[in-house]
Swiss-Prot record:
Region (Disordered): 47-123, 334-369, 404-424
Lineage: Eukaryota, Fungi, Dikarya, Ascomycota, Pezizomycotina
Name recorded for this polypeptide: Zn(2)-C6 fungal-type transcription factor mpsE
InterPro entries (alphabetical): Zn2-C6_fun-type_DNA-bd_sf (IPR036864), Zn2Cys6_DnaBD (IPR001138)
Pfam families in alphabetical order: Zn_clus (PF00172)
Organism listed in the record: Macrophomina phaseolina (strain MS6)
Biased composition, class Polar residues, residue ranges: 47-61
Length: 576
């Protein structure tokens, strides 16, 4: 027992580490002063409290300071005695921030020589300590508040202090093995896409296609500008109609009134309407179909027989060019031999008429359309509704002029040579300067043939917009399915009866369309239900139908009535 007592110092003479664990300090066998064995094994600095030095060097008042020594020391070892003969610690050697204390071990742990043996050092956890952490001798994990503070030696905060913001610093990317890819792959195509490195920003993995975002913003800007252009042109068309007296529905025009009306119709800017429709389609096609549209194939559901690729929009007349009820189309036979139709209207594939009472329901194979978000869908519908208003006003003006008898002769000032006409619209690109009087005339009735050509061009552009939007059949106007049901085409009806019928239909159009749009559930496969949403489109058109015609509204029913009236007037004037 005596030998064991000689190996250990008393509790009052123990170092800070041993005293904090309430253990006797084992002294070195060679000397009685200096570091103890526990601190030597732990490779830690063996420190002693300055109270021990005061006891040794004090001759007066030793009893008073002895009472202070008998008080239990606090955790952290700030008031522990030092070994006799040890040099007094100074402020530079042991600053208050670097006074170390060990983690408390439970009592009865003397089976190990030291709680800070090989298992308690950082050499086991980190065989090769990184430069970001201090040495193991400077670490004091027992003091929790000091360890978690930003100014302690446990956490090296120098990378954070070098930059202005707390987390705006550059990670060490020299060893990326510790940062695997998000899908545990090493594909070089999934490498980190870093932005500008002027401010030493953190390179982040970008999964968003920035080009697609810019394209979407560009499309939104174009649609917004196009909506403004639609509203401006609608106001101009209405002003153009009222400034020239519009269409007189009470009797036939004679004398100067008839010539003025013909001049007004000849200067009607249909080229601007075609250009607006073309811009609307050109903006929508890359947005709705970013991967392109495959050539659809029309399939007959009764025989499952593929009839080949459908003729592109603008090169077919199976839907809207059928102006007669007998199924015969107005083809090349109505054109005069001296004035052939344009090349892009002369090569049409005539569709076979469908049986009475049945609607053509072709299915098409095309690429999947992109789904629009609600703001973009509302912007598209806004442009489309404005375009519907322009078309409705245009067909109303044409219908008003075609209701009157054809003039005996046509003015020579509206005629153009064949080369001029071929150059103006044979290229297939709409010309905004194209006027109604520049269309190919006929010797007998130039207004009728020009109106027929204008209707063909306008309905082609309208049908292309409907196909791009993928509207259901009940929301279309340029196809057979969108024609009004029960339209009267009797040749014996006079102008007054037709006018009364159109007026009554216009009055009841809002209620009838609102009911039909609310109850209809017919949606084409891959149509508006996927691109925009049939319910959203019906809600917009239902609101449009509730607006009065004096406000430029009326909805799809008014446009259908105007289209049917123009077709009926053309059949009567051209004896079809």
């Amino acid at each position: 027992m005596a030998e064991n007592n000689e190996k250990y110092r008393s509790f009052r003479l123990a170092c800070d580490r041993c005293r904090s664990h309430k253990l006797k300090c084992p002294q070195q066998p060679s000397t009685a002063t200096g570091a103890c064995q526990r601190c030597t094994r732990a490779k830690a600095q063996c420190t002693f409290s300055p109270r021990s030095r005061a006891i040794k060097n004090t001759q007066d008042g030793g009893s008073i300071r002895g009472k202070a020594i008998k008080k239990p020391a606090k955790r952290g070892g700030s008031q522990s005695p030092s070994a006799p003969g040890s040099p007094p610690p100074t402020a530079t050697e042991n600053p208050p921030q670097q006074q170390q204390s060990d983690q408390q071990k439970p009592s009865g742990s003397n089976r190990w020589d030291s709680p800070w043996g090989p298992l308690g050092t950082f050499d086991v956890l980190y065989p090769t300590p990184q430069a970001a952490f201090p040495a193991a001798a400077e670490v004091s994990p027992s003091d929790f508040s000091a360890a978690m503070s930003m100014g302690s030696t446990f956490m090296d905060c120098s990378p954070f202090a070098e930059t202005s913001s707390g987390f705006d610093f550059q990670f060490d990317m020299d060893h990326p093995s510790g940062l695997p890819y998000y899908n545990n792959s090493t594909d070089p195509s999934l490498a980190v896409q870093s932005g500008g490195t002027e401010d030493d920003d953190v390179p982040m993995a970008s999964t968003v296609d920035n080009s697609r975002c810019h394209e979407k913003e560009d499309c939104t800007k174009k649609l917004s500008c196009l909506a403004v252009e639609f509203q401006r042109h609608l106001a101009l068309f209405n002003k153009h109609s009222t400034s020239h007296g519009g269409a007189d529905k009470k009797g036939a025009r004679t004398g100067s009134d008839g010539e003025e009306a013909q001049h007004w119709l000849s200067t009607y800017p249909i080229g601007e309407i075609l250009c607006l429709s073309g811009d609307f389609s050109s903006i929508l096609e890359p947005e709705l179909y970013p991967h392109g549209r495959a050539a659809p194939v029309s399939i007959d559901e009764t025989t499952n027989d593929a009839r080949g690729p459908v003729v592109p929009v603008g090169q077919r007349d199976g839907h809207h060019a059928n102006l007669s009820d007998s199924g015969t189309t107005i083809g090349l036979e109505v054109a005069h031999a001296g004035h052939p139709p344009p090349p892009h209207l002369s090569h049409h594939r005539h569709c076979q008429p469908s049986p009475p009472g049945s609607l053509p329901t072709p299915t098409s194979r095309s690429s999947t359309a992109a789904v629009m978000d609600t703001p973009t869908a509302l912007l598209i519908l806004n442009c489309y509704v404005s375009m519907i208003r322009i078309y409705s006003a245009l067909f109303a003006h044409l219908h008003a002029h075609l209701r009157h008898p054809a003039p005996s002769h046509s003015s020579a000032r509206h005629r153009h040579s064949r080369s001029t006409l071929h150059r103006r619209y044979s290229s297939g690109i709409p010309d905004p300067a194209l006027k109604f009087g520049e269309l190919p005339p006929a010797p007998s009735d130039d207004v009728s043939l020009r109106a027929y050509t204008a209707v063909r061009l306008l309905l082609d552009a309208l049908q292309r917009s409907e196909e791009l939007l993928g509207l259901p059949a009940d929301l279309r106007c340029a196809s057979v399915s969108g024609a009004p049901v029960g339209a009267r085409d009797d040749d014996g009806d006079d102008d007054e009866e037709e006018e009364e019928e159109d007026t009554a239909a216009a009055i009841l159009s809002s209620d009838s369309e609102a009911e039909s749009l609310g109850s209809s559930v017919c949606v084409l496969p891959g149509g508006c239900g996927e691109i925009i949403g049939a319910e959203l489109a019906r809600a917009v058109f239902r609101q449009e139908a509730q607006m009065g015609s004096e406000q430029g509204g009326g909805g799809l029913e008014v446009l259908r009535r105007n289209i049917a009236g123009v077709k009926r007037s053309l059949r009567q004037r051209m004896a079809l």
